[in-house]
Protein backbone atom coordinates (compact mmCIF):
# COMPACT_ATOMS: atom_id res chain seq x y z
CA UNK A 1 0.00 0.00 0.00
CA UNK A 2 1.34 3.35 -1.00
CA UNK A 3 -0.15 6.75 -0.31
CA UNK A 4 -0.61 8.37 -3.73
CA UNK A 5 -1.40 11.88 -2.48
CA UNK A 6 1.36 13.96 -0.88
CA UNK A 7 1.49 17.50 0.45
CA UNK A 8 4.85 18.96 -0.61
CA UNK A 9 4.75 22.16 1.45
CA UNK A 10 2.28 24.88 2.49
CA UNK A 11 1.47 25.67 -1.15
CA UNK A 12 1.58 22.46 -3.22
CA UNK A 13 0.45 18.84 -3.28
CA UNK A 14 0.95 16.02 -5.77
CA UNK A 15 -0.73 12.80 -6.72
CA UNK A 16 0.96 10.12 -8.72
CA UNK A 17 0.43 6.94 -10.67
CA UNK A 18 2.96 4.44 -11.94
CA UNK A 19 6.11 3.04 -10.40
CA UNK A 20 5.82 3.49 -6.64
CA UNK A 21 9.56 3.59 -5.98
CA UNK A 22 10.13 6.15 -8.74
CA UNK A 23 7.25 8.35 -7.58
CA UNK A 24 8.39 8.19 -3.95
CA UNK A 25 11.93 9.19 -4.94
CA UNK A 26 10.74 12.08 -7.12
CA UNK A 27 8.41 13.26 -4.34
CA UNK A 28 11.34 13.36 -1.89
CA UNK A 29 13.49 15.18 -4.44
CA UNK A 30 10.89 17.85 -5.27
CA UNK A 31 10.30 18.52 -1.55
CA UNK A 32 14.03 19.01 -1.04
CA UNK A 33 14.42 21.17 -4.17
CA UNK A 34 11.53 23.43 -3.16
CA UNK A 35 13.01 23.90 0.30
CA UNK A 36 16.49 24.60 -1.11
CA UNK A 37 15.11 27.11 -3.61
CA UNK A 38 13.21 28.89 -0.84
CA UNK A 39 16.33 29.05 1.36
CA UNK A 40 18.57 30.24 -1.49
CA UNK A 41 16.22 32.90 -2.85
CA UNK A 42 14.35 33.81 0.35
CA UNK A 43 11.05 33.49 -1.51
CA UNK A 44 8.51 30.79 -2.27
CA UNK A 45 8.36 29.25 -5.72
CA UNK A 46 5.31 30.00 -7.79
CA UNK A 47 3.18 27.31 -9.43
CA UNK A 48 4.83 27.54 -12.85
CA UNK A 49 8.33 27.25 -11.35
CA UNK A 50 7.26 24.30 -9.21
CA UNK A 51 5.64 22.50 -12.16
CA UNK A 52 8.70 23.03 -14.35
CA UNK A 53 11.06 21.90 -11.59
CA UNK A 54 9.00 18.74 -11.08
CA UNK A 55 8.86 18.16 -14.85
CA UNK A 56 12.66 18.37 -15.00
CA UNK A 57 13.01 15.81 -12.22
CA UNK A 58 10.59 13.45 -13.97
CA UNK A 59 12.41 13.90 -17.30
CA UNK A 60 15.81 13.21 -15.75
CA UNK A 61 14.50 10.07 -14.04
CA UNK A 62 13.51 8.38 -17.30
CA UNK A 63 16.90 9.24 -18.82
CA UNK A 64 18.80 7.38 -16.07
CA UNK A 65 20.12 4.01 -17.19
CA UNK A 66 18.48 1.36 -15.05
CA UNK A 67 17.64 -2.34 -15.06
CA UNK A 68 14.20 -1.39 -13.79
CA UNK A 69 12.89 1.64 -15.64
CA UNK A 70 10.78 3.87 -13.46
CA UNK A 71 7.76 5.54 -14.98
CA UNK A 72 5.63 7.91 -12.92
CA UNK A 73 2.83 10.31 -13.83
CA UNK A 74 2.19 13.26 -11.51
CA UNK A 75 -0.60 15.76 -10.97
CA UNK A 76 0.39 18.97 -9.18
CA UNK A 77 -2.07 21.25 -7.46
CA UNK A 78 -1.12 24.41 -5.69
CA UNK A 79 -1.50 28.06 -4.94
CA UNK A 80 0.56 31.20 -5.39
CA UNK A 81 -0.06 34.94 -5.63
CA UNK A 82 -1.74 34.45 -9.02
CA UNK A 83 -4.34 31.96 -7.75
CA UNK A 84 -4.98 28.22 -7.72
CA UNK A 85 -3.25 26.03 -10.31
CA UNK A 86 -3.44 22.47 -11.61
CA UNK A 87 -0.79 20.76 -13.75
CA UNK A 88 -0.52 17.38 -15.46
CA UNK A 89 3.06 16.06 -15.63
CA UNK A 90 3.54 13.09 -17.94
CA UNK A 91 6.21 10.42 -17.46
CA UNK A 92 8.33 12.10 -20.17
CA UNK A 93 8.52 15.29 -18.07
CA UNK A 94 6.10 17.32 -20.17
CA UNK A 95 4.05 19.88 -18.23
CA UNK A 96 0.46 20.83 -19.10
CA UNK A 97 -1.57 23.46 -17.22
CA UNK A 98 -5.12 22.20 -16.68
CA UNK A 99 -8.03 24.67 -16.45
CA UNK A 100 -10.57 22.49 -14.63
CA UNK A 101 -10.03 18.83 -13.71
CA UNK A 102 -7.74 15.94 -14.56
CA UNK A 103 -7.29 12.29 -13.68
CA UNK A 104 -4.34 9.94 -14.05
CA UNK A 105 -3.54 6.28 -13.68
CA UNK A 106 -5.11 3.11 -14.99
CA UNK A 107 -8.48 3.90 -13.42
CA UNK A 108 -8.67 7.38 -14.91
CA UNK A 109 -10.90 6.27 -17.78
CA UNK A 110 -13.55 5.34 -15.23
CA UNK A 111 -13.03 8.50 -13.17
CA UNK A 112 -13.38 10.64 -16.30
CA UNK A 113 -16.80 9.13 -16.96
CA UNK A 114 -17.97 10.56 -13.64
CA UNK A 115 -16.06 13.86 -13.90
CA UNK A 116 -17.28 14.64 -17.42
CA UNK A 117 -20.92 14.13 -16.50
CA UNK A 118 -21.02 15.69 -13.04
CA UNK A 119 -18.32 18.41 -12.88
CA UNK A 120 -19.53 22.01 -12.65
CA UNK A 121 -17.08 24.92 -12.46
CA UNK A 122 -19.30 26.62 -9.86
CA UNK A 123 -19.28 23.69 -7.39
CA UNK A 124 -18.69 24.31 -3.71
CA UNK A 125 -15.72 22.67 -2.00
CA UNK A 126 -18.11 20.22 -0.32
CA UNK A 127 -19.67 19.29 -3.67
CA UNK A 128 -16.19 18.90 -5.16
CA UNK A 129 -15.15 16.54 -2.38
CA UNK A 130 -18.26 14.42 -2.96
CA UNK A 131 -17.54 14.34 -6.71
CA UNK A 132 -13.94 13.22 -6.10
CA UNK A 133 -15.15 10.47 -3.75
CA UNK A 134 -17.56 9.24 -6.42
CA UNK A 135 -15.00 9.41 -9.25
CA UNK A 136 -12.24 7.62 -7.32
CA UNK A 137 -14.64 5.03 -5.92
CA UNK A 138 -15.88 4.31 -9.45
CA UNK A 139 -12.27 3.73 -10.56
CA UNK A 140 -11.54 1.53 -7.53
CA UNK A 141 -14.54 -0.69 -8.24
CA UNK A 142 -13.62 -1.22 -11.89
CA UNK A 143 -9.81 -1.26 -11.90
CA UNK A 144 -7.84 -3.52 -9.58
CA UNK A 145 -4.60 -1.57 -10.17
CA UNK A 146 -6.13 1.68 -8.84
CA UNK A 147 -5.44 0.80 -5.24
CA UNK A 148 -7.82 0.50 -2.34
CA UNK A 149 -8.35 3.87 -0.70
CA UNK A 150 -9.34 7.47 -1.21
CA UNK A 151 -7.30 10.49 -0.12
CA UNK A 152 -8.52 14.01 -0.83
CA UNK A 153 -6.51 17.21 -0.51
CA UNK A 154 -8.17 20.61 -0.94
CA UNK A 155 -6.14 23.53 -2.25
CA UNK A 156 -7.52 27.00 -1.69
CA UNK A 157 -5.96 30.44 -1.33
CA UNK A 158 -5.50 29.89 2.43
CA UNK A 159 -4.12 26.37 2.65
CA UNK A 160 -3.32 22.96 1.22
CA UNK A 161 -5.03 20.45 3.49
CA UNK A 162 -5.92 16.76 3.61
CA UNK A 163 -9.65 16.68 4.17
CA UNK A 164 -10.61 13.03 3.60
CA UNK A 165 -9.02 9.62 3.92
CA UNK A 166 -10.66 6.22 3.58
CA UNK A 167 -8.89 2.87 3.38
Regions found by a protein language model. Give the residues of each.
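Acidic, glycine-rich active-site loops and adjacent beta-strand->loop/helix elements
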Residues: 20, 80, 93, 135-137
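Short gly/pro-enriched beta-turn/loop segments at secondary-structure junctions
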Residues: 67-72, 80-84, 147
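Short hydrophobic alpha-helical segments used for membrane anchoring or interfacial signaling
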Residues: 76-79, 153-157
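Short arginine-rich
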Residues: 136-146
Amino acid sequence: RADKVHILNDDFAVTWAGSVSEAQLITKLIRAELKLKEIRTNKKTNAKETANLLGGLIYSSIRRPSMLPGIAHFLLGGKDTDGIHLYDLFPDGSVTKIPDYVSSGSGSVFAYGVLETKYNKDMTVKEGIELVKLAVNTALQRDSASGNGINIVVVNQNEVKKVYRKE
